[in-house]
C-alpha cells in the first residue's frame, strides 16, 4: 500500500488561523455576545444596556417567578444534576411527569424528552430509520434546520430535498419514490424566514404516498395557534411525530418528540443521544414543566400583537420584512453580508441588539437582520426598535418605496 504524500507540516493553530482569516474576509466571522443580565427586554450586552430584539425567550418565561421557583425547589430537593443517562440513573419522577405533561399538552399518546432540541432531531430521525438506510428515503424541505439535515445524514438514508414550502415539488418527488420506507420532514415555523409549513398538505401527501410525517415546530410552539400549541394547532393537522424544544418559548432547555407509544419505546432504546447523554438536571425539568403550565391564550395573544405591531411599523417606513404576520420571528431583508454586519453594528451603537444572519445559516447573498419580539416587550420598546431600524436602513440606502 502506497502511503499518501504528506503536506508540508504546519501547526494546527496556523492552519486554523488561515481558515479564520479567509472566513472573516468573506464577512462571515461571528463573535459571542456576553450577557450580564437575563433574557429581558432591556439587557446588558457586552457591558452596555440595549433593547433586546434577538432572544428566543418569546413568552418571557425564562424570567417568570413561578418557573424560577420551580427550578429552585427542584435543586433543593433533588440536587443540581441528574447523575446519569436516562437508562441508568437519570430518569427522575420529574422527567416522567414532564413527558406526560407534554404528551397531554399536544394530545399525543407519548412524549420523549432529550437533553437538547438538536439531539431530539438528530436521534429521532436516525432511530426511525434504524439500519434500513438502503431501504429508506427522507424528503426534506430545503430550509429545514441544521439538526434535521444532520439527522438525515447520519441516518444514511437517501435524502431528497424539495423546494421550500413547494408541495407540488414534494408530491412529484414522492411519486418517483423507489424505496419501501419514507419520512417527510419539515420545520413548522422556519426559524430564519418566519414562514410556515403547510402541515395539512404534508400530512395528507405523506399518507397518500405511504410515508410518515414529521414536523419540528421548535419556533411555533408557544408563539402560534390560539393557545400556543404551534403551527399544528394553527392549521388543525398533526403529524406522526412532532418534535420541539424547551429552549425557545418555554424559556428553558431540552427537546422532545411527541409520538405513539411504540415509537416512544423505540426512541428510548435506539435514539443514541437519549441512551448515551446525561439527562437534564432536576432544575431544568422542573422549570420546563412549570413553564408549560404558564402558556395560555392571553400570553400568546400579547406576543402576536407585538409581532404585528413591529411588522406594520417597519413596512410603513419602507423596510422589507417577511414571514407570517403573527410570527415572533421578523426577518428583515438586507442581501449583502458585509452590509448586514454594518446594519447590525449600527443598531448596537443605537442601543438595540439584533443580529445579522449570514451564510451558512442562510444562502450566500441573502443576509438578513433577524428580529424577534417577546411578549414582555412594551409598545414603546417596539416603536423605538422600528424607528431606529428605519433610520439606519435609510442611511444605508436599504429602504424601499412604501406601497
Protein language model regions, located:
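Conserved PLP-anchoring active-site segment centered on the Schiff-base-forming lysine
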Residues: 125-146
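Active-site phosphate-binding strand-loop segment of PLP-dependent enzymes
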Residues: 160-215
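Structural motif of enzymes handling amino- and sulfur-group chemistry
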Residues: 262, 279-296, 306, 316
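N-terminal "arm"/small-domain region of PLP-dependent enzymes with the aminotransferase-like
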Residues: 15-78, 211
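Short loop-beta-helix segment that forms the pyridoxal 5′-phosphate
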Residues: 85-89, 99-123
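Active-site PLP attachment segment
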Residues: 233-266
Amino acid at each position: 500500500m502506497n502511503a499518501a504524500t504528506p503536506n508540508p507540516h504546519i501547526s494546527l493553530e496556523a492552519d486554523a488561523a488561515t481558515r479564520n482569516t479567509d472566513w472573516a474576509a468573506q464577512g462571515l466571522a461571528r463573535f459571542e455576545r456576553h450577557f450580564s443580565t437575563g433574557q429581558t427586554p432591556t439587557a446588558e450586552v457586552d457591558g452596555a444596556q440595549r433593547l433586546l430584539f434577538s432572544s428566543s425567550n418569546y413568552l418571557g418565561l425564562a424570567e417568570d417567578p413561578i418557573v424560577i421557583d420551580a427550578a429552585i425547589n427542584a435543586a433543593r430537593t433533588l440536587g443540581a444534576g441528574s447523575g446519569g443517562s436516562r437508562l441508568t440513573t437519570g430518569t427522575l419522577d420529574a422527567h416522567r411527569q414532564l413527558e406526560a405533561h407534554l404528551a397531554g399538552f399536544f394530545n399525543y399518546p407519548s412524549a420523549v424528552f432529550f437533553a437538547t432540541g438538536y439531539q431530539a432531531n438528530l436521534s429521532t430521525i436516525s432511530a426511525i430509520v434504524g439500519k434500513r438506510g438502503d431501504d429508506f428515503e427522507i424528503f426534506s424541505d430545503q430550509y429545514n434546520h441544521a439538526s434535521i439535515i444532520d439527522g438525515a445524514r447520519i441516518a444514511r438514508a437517501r435524502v431528497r430535498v424539495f423546494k421550500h414550502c413547494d408541495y407540488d415539488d414534494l408530491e412529484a418527488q414522492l411519486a418517483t419514490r423507489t424505496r419501501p420506507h419514507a419520512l417527510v420532514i419539515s420545520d413548522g415555523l422556519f426559524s430564519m424566514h418566519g414562514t410556515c409549513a403547510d402541515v395539512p398538505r404534508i400530512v395528507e401527501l405523506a399518507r397518500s404516498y405511504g410515508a410518515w410525517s414529521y414536523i419540528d415546530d421548535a419556533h411555533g410552539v408557544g408563539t402560534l395557534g390560539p393557545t400556543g400549541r404551534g403551527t399544528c394547532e394553527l392549521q388543525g393537522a398533526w403529524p406522526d411525530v412532532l418534535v420541539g424544544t424547551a429552549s425557545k418559548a418555554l424559556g428553558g432547555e431540552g427537546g422532545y418528540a411527541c409520538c405513539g407509544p411504540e415509537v416512544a419505546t423505540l426512541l428510548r432504546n435506539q435514539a443514541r443521544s437519549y441512551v448515551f447523554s446525561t439527562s437534564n438536571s432536576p432544575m431544568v425539568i422542573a422549570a420546563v414543566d412549570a413553564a408549560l403550565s404558564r402558556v395560555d391564550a392571553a400570553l400568546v395573544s400579547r406576543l402576536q400583537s407585538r409581532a404585528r405591531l413591529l411588522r406594520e411599523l417597519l413596512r410603513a417606513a419602507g423596510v422589507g420584512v417577511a414571514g407570517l404576520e403573527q410570527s415572533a420571528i421578523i426577518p428583515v431583508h438586507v442581501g449583502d453580508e458585509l452590509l448586514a454586519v454594518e446594519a447590525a453594528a449600527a443598531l448596537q451603537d443605537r442601543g438595540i441588539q439584533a443580529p445579522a444572519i449570514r451564510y451558512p445559516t442562510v444562502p450566500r447573498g441573502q443576509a438578513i437582520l433577524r428580529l424577534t419580539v417577546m411578549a414582555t416587550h412594551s409598545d414603546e420598546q417596539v416603536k423605538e426598535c422600528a424607528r431606529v431600524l428605519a433610520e439606519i436602513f435609510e442611511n444605508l440606502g436599504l429602504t424601499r418605496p412604501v406601497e
